[in-house]
Regions:
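PLP-dependent amino-acid enzyme catalytic core
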Residues: 1-173
Length: 173
């Protein structure tokens, strides 16, 4: 497990801006007024896939060896991570297989397909989809892209924090 300083270095050197944009940090005026506190929102809904998940997926995939990208990647997700992996694969020119639960909303399935990924529907839960993704990864020699709990995914997603620090010179609680 990387140390905190290792993660900081990984965040500072993350490759996310080929697909992600630096999003604004905006005050939520109404919410701030109601709570009598300054509430800021990091507008990750402005990302190409409307979520911060693109950051982790792309950072992980951009760091894969060329041979791994040539074989392709696989992920299990019902939504935002799936779209992040699909867009990352599209940009990196590799095959992406996304295993989604059969209960996934059609709008999410279509969004993943529109990014060029192959969608496999399996089971009724994330765990069912994950188990099947791991089977396919082993069978087809695909690299599994975790939605979390991977140092490169964490570092990519951690760029949100780096931007917040850069965007706010004053103390943030």
């Amino acid at each position: 497990r990387p140390s905190y300083s290792d993660y900081l270095i990984r965040i500072l050197t993350a490759s996310v801006y080929d697909v992600a944009v630096e999003t604004p940090l905006e005050q939520a005026r109404s919410l701030s007024g109601r709570l009598k506190n300054n509430i800021l929102l990091k507008r990750e809904d402005l990302q190409p896939v409307f979520s911060f998940k693109i950051r982790g997926a792309y950072n992980k995939m951009a760091k894969l060896p060329k041979e791994s990208l040539a074989r392709g990647v696989i992920a299990a997700s019902a939504g935002n991570h799936a779209q992040g992996v699909a867009l990352s694969a599209q940009r990196l020119g590799c095959r992406a297989v996304i295993v989604m639960p059969e209960t996934s909303p059609q709008i999410k399935i279509d969004a993943v397909k529109n990014r060029g990924a192959e969608v496999v529907l399996k089971g009724v839960s994330y765990n069912d989809a994950y188990d099947h993704a791991m089977e396919l990864a082993a069978k087809d020699n695909l690299t599994y892209i975790a939605p979390f709990d991977d140092p490169d995914v964490i570092a990519g997603q951690g760029t949100v924090g780096m931007e917040i620090v850069r965007q706010r010179a004053d103390k943030i609680n």
